[in-house]
């Protein structure tokens, strides 16, 4: 009676069976490629070289991409490169040169990196098929997660996704962040129904570029679906906490809208209003009362569990600079696990965490050998990034040859045309999945301060401070010493803090508060475009703060360092410090504090490195006033 048995299977059961089979296939894929990691890496390198055989870059190196022995020639001849090394080629592509410069396939767009060069976002060329490769890595996440958290197909995910502004290069190619590219692609917008990826946020709300309207719309939809939400998250921990702070500020109006069944007039985007209107579906006083009862309580500890009671975990990146947000997430989460799932960048998507429910301190990413060709530059953990001698490609280590416990800088060769490109991430080998290593993220090279997607190095900070202190000169005041830290504990969003020790002439005119505020703004104006976008457009960083400390503070800081074993002959004041005893020492000697009075200017719509060519894209200057999140 096989026909009768088949007829008795419901469509839902059949779909569930098919989904289980698909998950099993994905997990088998992970097993297969990690077991044969060395073989897969050799295949990937051969494919990349053959696909890009006509690329001018490889021809300049003398690497015959489509000839026998191309891989050996590549290993022998291809140098290590940074973005500055390939910038002339990138600018040629941006300005409209369509010849095969870096890639044998047409460049489809530029992905703007959070890293900067000359104060501007780096432009990473990519090709159309790379989107499919990135989508393939996304497809591995739920099969891995479902092994540890069953039943995720029975509810919804409140994931808060946002797009950022984009523009076109003089040659007509889109330039945008990698996540904006994905959310605007058919892989996201035309995704087939999958019970494991049912989101509370309508696509229209995700695609809205107005930060306030997008956040408001996504949160009200998440609140309406609160009973069905099984997981919450955002890409970065900083973004998720910004959403919780938004809820803390706007819950009365959100509850009012739910109670009335009508969306607040502050959301004006027609597409967003239409999409949210389909979610609201009329007045719901009982739901509004339930949410209000939780939000009105004096303590917001555990608010995520209380507002979304069925939530099983918080899905956010908490490695690297995002680790500073773990205590705040734990406060609001009330014990919910923090799941850190994937490792990716604008250059390439790399791998995933095969144990996503582990403790944040135990997160290790398995690099998937099919994503790109991986190599590793050994790092001397005791060496200074700036003082270390320039490395050579002959010291590179293959994926399958790294050693447990050792630290390496990640180097990638991609299908899109990056060859032995230094990503700048320092990783530590934490274990192995079959033959593929698992890496713990250690740090980003040369980054002193980071709140969100910003990455500010010491040289850039020093140049900005040097320019800002000129405002003090008319009063005879000068800067004796300074340091900085990223304060993510006292404000959401976090902000940069500078500790300044000053010298003023006896009997001189006191420096007015307005001048210190000008100093704050001048520092911000001197930082890179990513920082300024986060401040002016995304509102993901708060106003920069200067804390003026008492005379002799940095002498006491040196005394503290010497008491902890530092050498007096080698000691120099740190330009960046971490929260802890040093910040407590500095805070104990603060005499005055000042904040930037407004946002720095930020222009959307171009990159000065190619705007100066005369074929500028449309530019828009953004200030804080229009995006009061």
UniProtKB/Swiss-Prot annotation:
Single GO MF descriptor: acid-amino acid ligase activity
Enzyme nomenclature, EC number: 6.3.2.-
UniProt xrefs under InterPro entries: GH3, GH3_C, GH3_M
Summary of the tissues where the protein is detected: Expressed in flowers.
Summary of the function given for this chain in its UniProt record: May catalyze the synthesis of indole-3-acetic acid (IAA)-amino acid conjugates, providing a mechanism for the plant to cope with the presence of excess auxin.
Family the UniProt entry places it in: Belongs to the IAA-amido conjugating enzyme family.
GO BP, sorted A to Z: response to auxin; response to light stimulus
Keywords from the named record: Ligase
Domain of life the protein comes from: Eukaryota
Cellular component terms per the entry's GO annotation: cytoplasm
Keyword Ligase: yes
Protein's organism: Oryza sativa subsp. japonica (Rice)
Gene name of the encoded protein: GH3.4
PANTHER family named in the record: GH3 DOMAIN-CONTAINING PROTEIN (PTHR31901), INDOLE-3-ACETIC ACID-AMIDO SYNTHETASE GH3.4-RELATED (PTHR31901:SF35)
Induction: By auxin.
Record has Methyltransferase as a keyword: no
Designated name of the protein: Probable indole-3-acetic acid-amido synthetase GH3.4
């Amino acid at each position: 009676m096989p026909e009768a048995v088949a007829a008795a299977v419901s469509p839902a059961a059949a779909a569930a069976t098919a989904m289980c089979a698909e998950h099993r296939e994905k997990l088998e894929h992970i097993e297969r490629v990690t077991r044969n990691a060395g073989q897969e890496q050799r295949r990937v390198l051969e494919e990349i070289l053959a696909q890009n055989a006509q690329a001018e870059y490889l021809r300049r190196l003398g690497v015959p991409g489509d000839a026998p022995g191309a891989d050996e020639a590549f290993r022998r001849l291809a140098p290590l490169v940074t973005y500055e090394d390939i910038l002339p080629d990138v600018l040629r592509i941006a300005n409209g040169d369509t010849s095969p410069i870096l890639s044998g396939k047409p460049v489809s767009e530029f992905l703007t990196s959070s890293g900067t060069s000359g104060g501007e976002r780096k432009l990473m060329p990519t090709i159309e098929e790379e989107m499919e490769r990135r989508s393939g890595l996304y497809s591995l996440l739920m099969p891995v997660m479902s092994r540890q958290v069953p039943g995720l197909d029975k509810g919804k995910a409140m994931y808060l996704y946002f797009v950022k502004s984009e523009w076109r290069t003089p040659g007509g190619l889109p330039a945008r962040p990698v996540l904006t590219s994905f959310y605007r692609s058919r892989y996201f917008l035309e995704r087939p129904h999958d019970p494991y990826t049912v989101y509370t946020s309508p696509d229209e709300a995700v695609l809205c570029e107005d930060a306030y309207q997008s956040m408001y719309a996504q949160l009200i939809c998440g609140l309406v679906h609160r009973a069905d939400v099984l997981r919450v998250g955002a890409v970065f921990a900083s973004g998720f906490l910004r959403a919780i702070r938004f809820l803390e500020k706007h819950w009365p109006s959100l509850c009012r809208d739910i109670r009335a069944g009508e969306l607040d007039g502050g959301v004006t985007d027609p597409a967003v209003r239409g999409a949210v209107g389909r979610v609201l579906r009329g007045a719901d006083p009982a739901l509004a009362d339930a949410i209000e009862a939780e939000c009105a309580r004096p303590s917001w500890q555990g608010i995520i569990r209380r507002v979304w009671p069925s939530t099983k975990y918080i899905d956010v990146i908490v490695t690297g600079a995002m680790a500073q947000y773990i205590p705040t997430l734990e406060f609001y989460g009330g014990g919910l696990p923090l799941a850190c799932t994937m490792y990716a960048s604008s250059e390439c998507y790399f791998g995933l965490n095969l144990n996503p429910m582990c403790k944040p301190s135990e997160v290790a990413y398995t690099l998937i050998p099919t994503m790109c060709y991986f190599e590793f530059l050994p790092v001397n953990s005791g060496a200074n990034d700036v003082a270390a001698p320039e490395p050579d490609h002959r010291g590179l280590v293959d994926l399958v040859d790294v050693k447990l416990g050792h630290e390496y800088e990640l180097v990638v060769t991609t299908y899109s045309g990056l060859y032995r490109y230094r990503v700048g991430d320092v990783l530590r080998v934490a274990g192995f999945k079959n033959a593929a290593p698992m890496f713990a993220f250690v740090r980003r090279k040369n980054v002193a301060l980071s709140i969100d997607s910003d990455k500010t190095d010491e040289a850039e900070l020093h140049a900005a401070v040097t320019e800002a202190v000129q405002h003090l000169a008319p009063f005879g005041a000068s800067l004796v010493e300074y340091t900085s830290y990223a304060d993510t504990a006292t404000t959401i969003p976090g902000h940069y803090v500078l500790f300044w020790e000053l010298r003023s002439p006896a009997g001189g005119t006191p420096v007015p508060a307005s001048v210190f505020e000008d100093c704050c703004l001048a520092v911000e104006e001197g930082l890179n475009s990513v920082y300024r976008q986060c401040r002016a457009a995304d509102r993901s960083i708060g106003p920069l703060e200067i804390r003026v400390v008492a005379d002799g503070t940095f002498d006491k800081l040196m005394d503290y360092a010497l008491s902890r074993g530092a050498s007096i002959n080698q000691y120099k004041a740190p330009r960046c410090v971490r929260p802890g005893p040093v910040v407590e020492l500095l805070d104990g000697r603060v005499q005055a504090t000042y904040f930037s009075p407004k946002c720095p200017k930020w222009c959307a719509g171009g990159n000065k490195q190619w705007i100066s060519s005369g074929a500028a894209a449309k530019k828009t200057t953004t200030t804080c006033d229009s995006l009061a999140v």
